[in-house]
From Swiss-Prot:
Region: Disordered, residue numbers: 1-27
GO terms under biological process: auxin-activated signaling pathway; cotyledon development
SUPFAM superfamilies: Protein kinase-like (PK-like)
PROSITE patterns, per database record: AGC_KINASE_CTER (PS51285), PROTEIN_KINASE_DOM (PS50011), PROTEIN_KINASE_ST (PS00108)
Function comment: Serine/threonine-protein kinase involved in the regulation of auxin signaling. Plays a minor role in the regulation of cellular auxin efflux and cotyledon organogenesis.
Keyword line: ATP-binding, Auxin signaling pathway, Developmental protein, Kinase, Nucleotide-binding, Phosphoprotein, Serine/threonine-protein kinase, Transferase
Species: Arabidopsis thaliana
Protein name: Protein kinase PINOID 2
UniProt keyword annotation of Cytoplasm present: no
Domain of life: Eukaryota
Reaction equation(s) it catalyzes: L-seryl-[protein] + ATP = O-phospho-L-seryl-[protein] + ADP + H(+); L-threonyl-[protein] + ATP = O-phospho-L-threonyl-[protein] + ADP + H(+)
InterPro entries: AGC-kinase_C, Kinase-like_dom_sf, Prot_kinase_dom, Ser/Thr_kinase_AS
Loss of function: phenotype: No visible phenotype under normal growth conditions.
Length: 525
């Protein structure tokens, strides 16, 4: 049972703040070892045929970026063999389980483009038996071309180190942004924006046959334009996936169909199987508009029954009743059209992919991962529910005094919500919708979890996302834009500043043209 308490209060302060730092994390530090390497381009750099094909291919979403153009110019100058000697490292941005990430620039480049360079000590991760994870991340990054996924600009090796040059996100991660809100949580409107873009990114990954398995605010980064980018794919795995066309008649079948009735078939021999990646086309249909019927808001409390579905039970605290348009193909709210209602669309969900790996952050682990009975793409929808909960309420729902108690809570504890104060009927309704979505995502039985059969298309249709124009989601102004903050702070400065970066890390022309020097210790910051 999910308990909920929402109260009205006038003049409650907003949660949002435009102050944010570029890095904050709950992770432990990772220390790299020393290495020696020749400064020559031919000896320090190594690119496999797969790397050349994957990382140098045309990526339409990045073709006009300054960082992409600068990297293309570098490849032309050095004969495509990009190596460590071509970059100047400025500072460490953070560290993870298999590597550290550094801010860097191309030496001698006229552009002020910044990159994030992930450095993996292959010997260290081999000892920890995690080398396969590093290789899988490299392979997956080479496949991606999406506005909300990272771009892999270059990949090379030096000594026993592996280097991945990726997009730099100056806004930091959502965990850091959340901590800088007055109440350490986001408003519903901000949560809806970040959750919608994250959902589109997960949809793309699933259409590519990639199960992410590591969604959390620390892994959702903020680009300079305020839009999101997923990061850290070392826990992901790949499998075959075949997109299917979902008609209006199929959408009402919901979770009543059995596994044998599912029209999609996937296959994956191992968690890290290598298959030909799918180049998906995410459908953005433009149906004729129709008016949605007005909602009548009453008081109710949301409860979750034993079967894992949600019921609305009358109460004096929180409730709602809805009048729905039975055949509407789109819903209009505040000038924004929700085109996911009853329209034919393409979906691809790797529901038959299976892994028994115990991976992830404890507070975000799905019950099926903890039980060790095998898990598939439904784990991403569980973590998505935890992600929503933390964004709105400032904490995760099952956190215990230690990791062991946290795991027990995930398996056995009921879902509950803290008391929340709202100021208006609109906020009241939004909070009820948010809690209802979280309840349907945090169903312990993965087969009954929202999204387990038809993926993101089920989640997009939920009332929480009503009014979101999925086809034009990149046109919506984000709650916070690092680029605008930079322009304000550097007003009157003649320098061209493209990224949110402290002035002490900006390279002068002399520094950019300094001769390359290999340090005895890579981790010299």
């Amino acid at each position: 049972m999910a308990n909920s308490s929402i109260f009205y209060k006038d003049n409650e302060s907003d949660y949002e703040s435009s102050t944010v730092g570029p890095d904050s994390s709950r992770r432990t530090s990772w220390l790299s070892s020393s290495f020696t390497a020749s400064p020559s381009c031919s000896s320090i750099s190594h690119l496999s045929n797969h790397g050349l094909n994957s990382y140098n291919q045309s990526k339409p979403h990045k073709a006009n970026q300054v960082a992409w153009e600068a990297m293309a110019r570098l490849r032309r100058c050095c004969g495509r063999a990009v190596g460590l000697e071509h970059f100047r490292l400025l500072k460490r941005l953070g560290s993870g389980d298999i590597g550290s990430v550094y801010l860097c620039q191309i030496r001698g480049s006229p552009e002020t483009a910044f990159y994030a360079m992930k450095v993996v000590d292959k010997e260290a991760v081999a000892v920890k038996k995690k080398l396969g994870r590093a290789e899988m991340e490299k392979k997956i990054l080479g496949m991606l071309d999406h506005p909300f996924c990272p771009t892999l600009y270059a990949a090379f090796e030096a000594s026993h180190y592996s280097f991945l040059v990726m997009e730099y996100c100056p806004g930091g991660d959502l965990y850091a942004v959340r901590l800088r809100q007055p109440s350490k949580r986001f408003t519903i409107s901000s949560t809806r924006f970040y959750a919608a873009e994250t959902l589109v990114a997960l949809e793309y990954l699933h259409m590519m046959g990639i199960v992410y398995r590591d969604l959390k605010p620390e892994n959702v980064l903020i680009r300079e334009d305020g839009h999101v980018m997923l990061s850290d794919f070392d826990l992901s795995f790949k499998c075959d996936v075949v997109p299917q066309f979902l008609s209006d008649n199929d959408r009402d079948r919901g979770h009543q169909e059995d596994d044998d009735d599912i029209s999609i078939r996937r296959k994956c021999s191992t968690p890290s199987c290598t298959t030909t990646p799918l180049n998906p086309v995410i459908s953005c249909f433009s149906p004729t508009s129709s008016r949605r019927r007005k909602k009548n808001v009453v008081t109710t409390t949301i409860h979750e029954n034993a079967a894992g579905t949600s019921d609305s039970v009358k109460s004096n605290d929180v409730s709602r009743t809805f009048s729905r348009s039975p055949s509407s193909c789109s819903r209009v709210s505040n000038g924004l059209r929700d085109i996911s209602g009853g329209c034919p669309s393409i979906f691809a969900e790797p529901i038959n992919a299976r892994s028994k790996s115990f991976v992830g952050t404890h507070e975000y682990l799905a019950p099926e991962v903890i039980s060790g009975q095998g898990h598939g793409s439904a784990v991403d929808w569980w973590t998505y529910g935890i992600f929503l909960y933390e964004m709105i309420f400032g904490r995760t729902p099952f956190k215990g005094d230690n990791n062991e108690k946290t795991l027990v809570n995930i398996l056995k504890a009921p879902l509950t919500f803290p008391k929340v104060i709202v100021n208006s009927p609109k906020e009241y309704e939004d909070m009820v919708n948010a809690q209802d979505l979280i309840i349907k995502l945090l169903v312990k039985n993965p087969k009954k979890r929202l999204g387990s059969l038809k993926g993101s298309i089920e989640i997009k249709r939920h009332e929480f996302f009503e009014g979101v124009n999925w086809a034009l989601i990149r046109s919506i102004k984000p709650p916070w834009v690092p680029k605008e903050e930079t322009s304000h702070k550097t007003k009157g400065d003649n320098r061209s500043v493209n990224y949110y970066l402290p002035p002490r890390f900006m390279m002068s022309r002399k520094e950019r043209n300094e001769p390359y020097h290999v340090s005895n210790y890579f981790d010299y910051f």
